[in-house]
């Protein structure tokens, strides 16, 4: 089983959304994939999720960001405790920030995608958050030479 944590997933339209969909779709051909995604439009998200239910399972989380993140973590921990997980893939360091602290000792390989705009350092605290999160990731995949 592969778990994918993402803030950016269809039914929303965008480059990262496309990337995450294709990643799930093709990994789902040979693996059980569960996607933990934010919910943006209940009806469109439900139609999309139903269309691809044979390829991967999508768990949607809505509400205030603070609670949404924690609800994802709670369900993530439950799934990990009940299943053998091959890997966890995140669309961003922000998707991995809270889980990285909780999953540190689970010995599950982790992959984090990094995109140019999201690693622009805003202040010392922001830089520290990024650095502390990424040091807990097994593999970092950047989308450009600039991002490396």
Model-predicted segments: where are they?
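Active-site proximal beta-strand in glycosyltransferases
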Residues: 2, 87, 103-120, 141
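N-terminal strand-loop element at the rim of the active site
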Residues: 7-13, 20, 25-68
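A short, histidine- and acid-enriched strand-loop-helix "catalytic/donor-clamping" loop
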Residues: 12, 67, 96-97, 110-125, ...
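Short, well-ordered alpha-helix to beta-strand connector turns
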Residues: 30-31, 85, 137
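Short, well-structured alpha-helical segments in soluble
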Residues: 74-83
């Amino acid at each position: 089983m592969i778990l994918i944590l993402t803030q950016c997933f269809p039914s929303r339209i965008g480059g990262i959304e496309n990337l995450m969909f294709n990643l799930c779709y093709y990994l789902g051909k040979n693996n059980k994939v569960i996607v933990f995604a934010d919910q943006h439009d209940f009806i469109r998200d439900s139609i999309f999720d139903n269309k691809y239910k044979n390829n991967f399972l999508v768990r949607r989380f809505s509400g205030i960001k603070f609670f949404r993140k924690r609800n994802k973590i709670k369900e993530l921990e439950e799934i990990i405790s009940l299943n053998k997980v091959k890997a966890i893939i995140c669309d961003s360091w922000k998707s991995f920030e809270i889980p990285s602290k909780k999953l540190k000792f689970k010995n599950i390989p982790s992959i984090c995608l990094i995109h140019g705009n999201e690693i622009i350092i805003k202040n010392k605290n922001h830089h520290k958050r990024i650095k502390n999160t990424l040091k807990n990731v097994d593999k970092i995949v950047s989308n450009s030479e600039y991002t490396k």
